[in-house]
Design a protein with these regions (language model features):
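Core catalytic alpha/beta fold that binds nucleotide/phospho-ligands
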Residues: 1-123
């Protein structure tokens, strides 16, 4: 409910651009000029994407004040439907410098979203 309110409010497009990367915005139908309200499923997906960002920041140990923007950490879906992280900008450099890869699991039900992030050292 909070995500739908944030995205549907008067500053929804600004919020979307600050929080969600291009692939997430496209998947959620948040492109500029699209003023249609978010469906319950899309709002739940947006909440899960946000939870994925929080899970990554916690696993990385940086918190929200970390060295990168939320829109640089994207939760995308593979053709199979499986979620996967896509990093850009500072988050991609941070991952590369540390030789890390991230695994992601998402779930949402009953208005709640849950994400798990596991960071592994590339070998």
């Amino acid at each position: 409910a909070r995500m739908a309110k944030s995205l549907g409010g008067p500053h929804g497009s600004t919020f979307a651009a600050r929080v969600f990367g291009p692939a997430e915005q496209e998947a959620l139908g948040l492109s500029e000029g699209n003023s249609s309200p978010l469906s319950a499923h899309k709002a739940a997906s947006a909440a899960a994407d946000f939870a994925a960002k929080e899970a990554f920041l916690k696993a990385a140990g940086t918190g929200l004040a970390g060295p990168f923007a939320l829109c640089e950490i994207e939760a995308v879906r593979l053709e199979s439907g499986a979620p996967e992280y896509r990093f850009s900008g500072g988050s991609a450099r941070w991952m590369d410098e540390r030789h890390l890869r991230a695994k992601l699991s998402l779930s949402h039900d009953g208005g709640m979203a849950l994400a798990f992030c596991i960071l592994e050292t590339e070998t």
